Amino acid sequence: MEGLIKDLKNILSKKKRIAITTHTNPDGDAIGSSLALFLLFKKMDLDVKVITPNQHPEFLNWVPGCDEIIIYENNQKFAGEIINNSDTIFTLDFNDLKRCGNISENINPNTQNLVMIDHHQSPSNYAKIMFSNPEISSTCELVYIIAEKLGLKKLIDKDIATCIYLGMMTDTGSFQYNGVNGDTHKILSFLLDKGINQSEIYNNIYNSCLLYTSPSPRDQ
Protein backbone atom coordinates (compact mmCIF):
# COMPACT_ATOMS: atom_id res chain seq x y z
CA MET A 1 0.00 0.00 0.00
CA GLU A 2 2.90 2.40 0.63
CA GLY A 3 3.55 2.88 -3.09
CA LEU A 4 -0.12 3.62 -3.71
CA ILE A 5 -0.16 6.13 -0.85
CA LYS A 6 2.86 7.90 -2.33
CA ASP A 7 1.13 8.12 -5.71
CA LEU A 8 -2.04 9.44 -4.10
CA LYS A 9 -0.13 12.06 -2.13
CA ASN A 10 1.40 13.26 -5.37
CA ILE A 11 -2.02 13.62 -7.00
CA LEU A 12 -3.55 15.44 -4.04
CA SER A 13 -0.59 17.82 -3.75
CA LYS A 14 -1.41 19.25 -7.18
CA LYS A 15 -4.80 20.48 -5.90
CA LYS A 16 -6.64 19.57 -9.07
CA ARG A 17 -10.39 19.20 -9.55
CA ILE A 18 -11.71 16.04 -7.92
CA ALA A 19 -14.95 14.11 -8.39
CA ILE A 20 -16.10 11.28 -6.15
CA THR A 21 -18.68 8.79 -7.37
CA THR A 22 -20.40 5.61 -6.21
CA HIS A 23 -22.25 2.65 -7.66
CA THR A 24 -25.90 2.93 -8.69
CA ASN A 25 -28.44 2.68 -5.88
CA PRO A 26 -25.85 3.83 -3.32
CA ASP A 27 -26.12 2.18 0.09
CA GLY A 28 -24.79 3.12 3.51
CA ASP A 29 -21.20 2.16 2.73
CA ALA A 30 -21.19 3.99 -0.61
CA ILE A 31 -22.70 7.17 0.84
CA GLY A 32 -20.67 7.00 4.03
CA SER A 33 -17.33 6.45 2.31
CA SER A 34 -17.89 9.04 -0.41
CA LEU A 35 -19.01 11.72 2.04
CA ALA A 36 -16.22 10.91 4.50
CA LEU A 37 -13.69 11.41 1.70
CA PHE A 38 -15.52 14.51 0.46
CA LEU A 39 -15.53 16.17 3.89
CA LEU A 40 -11.89 15.21 4.43
CA PHE A 41 -10.85 16.77 1.12
CA LYS A 42 -12.86 19.92 1.84
CA LYS A 43 -10.87 20.35 5.05
CA MET A 44 -7.77 20.19 2.85
CA ASP A 45 -9.19 23.04 0.70
CA LEU A 46 -9.44 20.82 -2.36
CA ASP A 47 -11.91 21.40 -5.21
CA VAL A 48 -14.12 18.34 -4.76
CA LYS A 49 -17.64 17.24 -5.69
CA VAL A 50 -19.67 14.08 -4.95
CA ILE A 51 -21.82 12.73 -7.76
CA THR A 52 -24.00 9.65 -7.38
CA PRO A 53 -25.59 7.91 -10.38
CA ASN A 54 -29.08 8.09 -8.90
CA GLN A 55 -30.97 8.97 -5.74
CA HIS A 56 -29.89 7.45 -2.45
CA PRO A 57 -32.51 6.20 0.04
CA GLU A 58 -34.32 8.90 1.99
CA PHE A 59 -33.21 7.46 5.31
CA LEU A 60 -29.65 8.54 4.45
CA ASN A 61 -30.57 12.22 4.08
CA TRP A 62 -29.31 12.95 7.61
CA VAL A 63 -25.71 11.94 6.82
CA PRO A 64 -23.27 14.88 7.15
CA GLY A 65 -22.59 16.39 3.73
CA CYS A 66 -25.54 14.64 2.09
CA ASP A 67 -27.08 17.94 1.00
CA GLU A 68 -24.05 18.56 -1.23
CA ILE A 69 -24.44 15.37 -3.28
CA ILE A 70 -25.11 15.95 -6.97
CA ILE A 71 -27.43 13.32 -8.44
CA TYR A 72 -26.47 12.48 -12.02
CA GLU A 73 -29.85 11.26 -13.26
CA ASN A 74 -31.50 14.50 -12.08
CA ASN A 75 -29.06 16.82 -13.87
CA GLN A 76 -27.03 14.87 -16.39
CA LYS A 77 -25.57 17.85 -18.25
CA PHE A 78 -24.33 19.64 -15.13
CA ALA A 79 -23.03 16.49 -13.46
CA GLY A 80 -21.48 15.25 -16.70
CA GLU A 81 -19.56 18.50 -17.13
CA ILE A 82 -18.18 18.23 -13.60
CA ILE A 83 -16.96 14.70 -14.26
CA ASN A 84 -15.53 15.60 -17.68
CA ASN A 85 -13.64 18.54 -16.20
CA SER A 86 -12.27 16.64 -13.21
CA ASP A 87 -8.59 15.74 -13.23
CA THR A 88 -9.03 12.96 -10.66
CA ILE A 89 -12.02 10.70 -10.09
CA PHE A 90 -12.42 8.56 -6.99
CA THR A 91 -14.67 5.54 -7.49
CA LEU A 92 -15.92 4.26 -4.15
CA ASP A 93 -17.51 0.97 -3.16
CA PHE A 94 -17.39 -0.62 -6.61
CA ASN A 95 -14.67 -2.13 -8.78
CA ASP A 96 -16.09 -2.13 -12.32
CA LEU A 97 -17.01 1.07 -14.16
CA LYS A 98 -20.23 -0.52 -15.38
CA ARG A 99 -21.51 -0.31 -11.81
CA CYS A 100 -21.70 3.49 -11.86
CA GLY A 101 -24.21 3.44 -14.72
CA ASN A 102 -24.25 6.25 -17.27
CA ILE A 103 -21.67 8.20 -15.30
CA SER A 104 -19.07 5.90 -16.88
CA GLU A 105 -19.72 7.56 -20.25
CA ASN A 106 -18.12 10.74 -18.90
CA ILE A 107 -15.03 9.04 -17.49
CA ASN A 108 -11.85 8.67 -19.54
CA PRO A 109 -9.20 6.50 -17.85
CA ASN A 110 -6.68 7.61 -20.48
CA THR A 111 -6.80 11.31 -19.58
CA GLN A 112 -8.02 11.31 -15.97
CA ASN A 113 -6.52 9.93 -12.79
CA LEU A 114 -8.85 7.21 -11.55
CA VAL A 115 -8.58 6.06 -7.94
CA MET A 116 -10.48 2.95 -6.85
CA ILE A 117 -11.31 2.47 -3.17
CA ASP A 118 -13.25 -0.75 -2.71
CA HIS A 119 -13.50 -3.99 -0.75
CA HIS A 120 -15.26 -6.29 -3.22
CA GLN A 121 -13.68 -9.28 -4.94
CA SER A 122 -12.38 -9.51 -8.53
CA PRO A 123 -11.73 -5.84 -9.39
CA SER A 124 -11.40 -4.81 -13.02
CA ASN A 125 -8.20 -3.02 -13.97
CA TYR A 126 -9.53 0.44 -14.87
CA ALA A 127 -7.95 2.66 -12.22
CA LYS A 128 -4.48 4.18 -12.09
CA ILE A 129 -4.45 3.73 -8.31
CA MET A 130 -6.29 0.73 -6.89
CA PHE A 131 -6.98 0.42 -3.18
CA SER A 132 -8.73 -2.93 -3.32
CA ASN A 133 -8.93 -5.28 -0.34
CA PRO A 134 -11.74 -7.85 0.00
CA GLU A 135 -10.57 -8.69 3.53
CA ILE A 136 -11.56 -5.25 4.80
CA SER A 137 -15.04 -5.04 6.34
CA SER A 138 -16.22 -2.08 4.30
CA THR A 139 -15.13 0.67 1.95
CA CYS A 140 -15.56 3.09 4.86
CA GLU A 141 -12.97 1.18 6.88
CA LEU A 142 -10.61 1.34 3.91
CA VAL A 143 -11.14 5.11 3.63
CA TYR A 144 -10.13 5.43 7.29
CA ILE A 145 -6.99 3.35 6.71
CA ILE A 146 -6.03 5.44 3.68
CA ALA A 147 -6.59 8.68 5.61
CA GLU A 148 -4.38 7.37 8.39
CA LYS A 149 -1.64 6.36 5.93
CA LEU A 150 -1.83 9.82 4.34
CA GLY A 151 -1.24 11.42 7.73
CA LEU A 152 -4.74 12.92 7.74
CA LYS A 153 -6.13 11.18 10.81
CA LYS A 154 -5.99 14.46 12.72
CA LEU A 155 -8.52 15.95 10.28
CA ILE A 156 -11.18 13.37 11.09
CA ASP A 157 -13.87 15.17 13.08
CA LYS A 158 -17.27 14.05 14.37
CA ASP A 159 -18.98 14.43 10.98
CA ILE A 160 -16.34 12.43 9.12
CA ALA A 161 -16.29 9.84 11.89
CA THR A 162 -20.08 9.54 11.61
CA CYS A 163 -19.84 8.88 7.87
CA ILE A 164 -17.18 6.22 8.39
CA TYR A 165 -19.12 4.53 11.19
CA LEU A 166 -22.26 4.45 9.04
CA GLY A 167 -20.65 2.39 6.30
CA MET A 168 -18.86 0.10 8.70
CA MET A 169 -22.08 -0.59 10.58
CA THR A 170 -24.31 -1.19 7.57
CA ASP A 171 -21.85 -3.35 5.65
CA THR A 172 -21.11 -5.63 8.59
CA GLY A 173 -24.64 -6.28 9.83
CA SER A 174 -23.92 -4.08 12.85
CA PHE A 175 -20.47 -5.69 13.27
CA GLN A 176 -21.66 -9.29 13.18
CA TYR A 177 -20.03 -10.56 9.96
CA ASN A 178 -16.72 -12.41 9.72
CA GLY A 179 -14.87 -9.44 8.20
CA VAL A 180 -14.94 -7.70 11.58
CA ASN A 181 -11.69 -8.13 13.51
CA GLY A 182 -9.53 -6.47 16.13
CA ASP A 183 -8.41 -3.74 13.74
CA THR A 184 -12.05 -2.94 13.01
CA HIS A 185 -12.74 -2.42 16.71
CA LYS A 186 -9.65 -0.23 17.12
CA ILE A 187 -11.07 2.03 14.43
CA LEU A 188 -14.46 1.98 16.14
CA SER A 189 -12.79 3.10 19.36
CA PHE A 190 -11.25 6.07 17.56
CA LEU A 191 -14.59 6.99 15.98
CA LEU A 192 -16.35 6.83 19.34
CA ASP A 193 -13.73 9.12 20.82
CA LYS A 194 -14.70 11.66 18.15
CA GLY A 195 -18.14 11.87 19.73
CA ILE A 196 -20.31 9.95 17.28
CA ASN A 197 -23.76 8.92 18.50
CA GLN A 198 -24.02 5.17 17.92
CA SER A 199 -27.66 4.81 18.90
CA GLU A 200 -28.74 7.76 16.79
CA ILE A 201 -26.96 6.39 13.72
CA TYR A 202 -28.48 2.95 14.30
CA ASN A 203 -31.98 4.36 14.75
CA ASN A 204 -31.67 6.54 11.65
CA ILE A 205 -30.96 3.42 9.60
CA TYR A 206 -32.77 0.49 11.15
CA ASN A 207 -35.65 2.16 12.96
CA SER A 208 -36.55 4.66 10.25
CA CYS A 209 -39.88 4.49 8.49
CA LEU A 210 -38.11 2.90 5.54
CA LEU A 211 -36.78 -0.60 6.13
CA TYR A 212 -33.06 -1.05 5.59
CA THR A 213 -31.52 -4.48 5.26
CA SER A 214 -27.76 -4.85 5.63
CA PRO A 215 -26.08 -6.58 2.68
CA SER A 216 -25.17 -10.18 3.23
CA PRO A 217 -21.47 -10.99 3.70
CA ARG A 218 -21.31 -12.01 0.03
CA ASP A 219 -22.85 -8.75 -1.21
CA GLN A 220 -20.97 -6.26 0.95
Q: How should these model regions be labeled?
A:
Residues 212-220:
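Single conserved hydrophobic/aromatic residue that forms the stacking wall/gate
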